[in-house]
């Protein structure tokens, strides 16, 4: 994660610090004019002086200020660069170029490079948490972990709450396998308002997902503590609540997950994730229907409604309320006639009922056009072709379904066995029928 750039308050962009130039009779008029904001009069004097003395660093510096005042920023920055080339020991030149670059997007790499050069050339002057963190990050990128650790620790000794340094140091500890130090350091990043919760939840989820069985046994409680830290810091943030629920699912705690997603539905009833997770966490069809119907009272986004319509249609079909099932499939397709998942599910249910097979085939074919390698869609289409007695083509699509991941799916194997039997390939049909029943 990039260390966020701060333009420190004492970096004054168009500073007219006298430098040693005020003692230069050739420069004094230019400086006095600039101090009086008379850039148009100062500019030709600076240009004239550069023609006479092209190695006069101060003349380049002040000409750059004149260009900047006129809005010719590229010329200004080139002048500041030339001043640095002529006198690399003058930190004022670095400062003005640094701030000039920082004023625009697209110069981040140049600004970081310049800041690192300033740190290295003038260490006592720029020994701040920001510069030390920037230096530490650069050293990490160049595999100088020991130096990086020193500078990041120095940054935190100056400001223990400086999140960029804490994050970089924690990551350094994690990659080194020093998990005790990691768990001590990373909360500073998680509790800081320096970064948005979107960044923090995304980062923490990536860390959590790396936990396998062994690491969970060793660090489970400490990983839980990180999630709790984030949730306590932002108790009503939707992303933090969602993360806590997903972590409980990931670690096999569905009841705790359900509580988090119930909170999410309560705090953010128009956020579909809470309803969808609750829908799938319950094993009761009756409760699923209740959750889905309640969700429809709050959700307004088209894609969210389609998802709930599709889920409700499947549950209603399972409970035998087929008219409601087909009603919700139709509602979903009115919102998006090309939704591949809805088309496939609707077509498959029609095939199970042996009704409207022509319509089912058309919908299934449309879903396959969107996702030609989807094993479930291939199975649906192949099975419908079987029901319509197009056995040769049914075999082609069901074989594709097996190739694309359906080789362990009992329904796919069963449908393929039916097709083989219809084609008279009894021995192979028996083989797949037996596999489908294991």
Predicted regions and their residues:
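Canonical positions in the second alpha-helix
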Residues: 48-49, 82-83, 118-122, 154-155, ...
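Canonical tetratricopeptide repeat
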Residues: 62, 96-99, 134, 168, ...
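Helix-start (N-cap) detector for alpha-helical repeat units in TPR-like alpha-solenoids
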Residues: 23-24, 57-58, 91-92, 126-130, ...
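N-terminal leader/linker segments that initiate helical-solenoid repeat arrays
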Residues: 19-62, 74, 78, 85-90, ...
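Register position in tetratricopeptide repeats
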Residues: 35-36, 69-70, 103-104, 141, ...
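Residue-level recognition of tetratricopeptide repeat
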Residues: 31, 65, 99, 137, ...
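Structural marker of alpha-solenoid helical repeat scaffolds
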Residues: 52, 86, 121-125, 158, ...
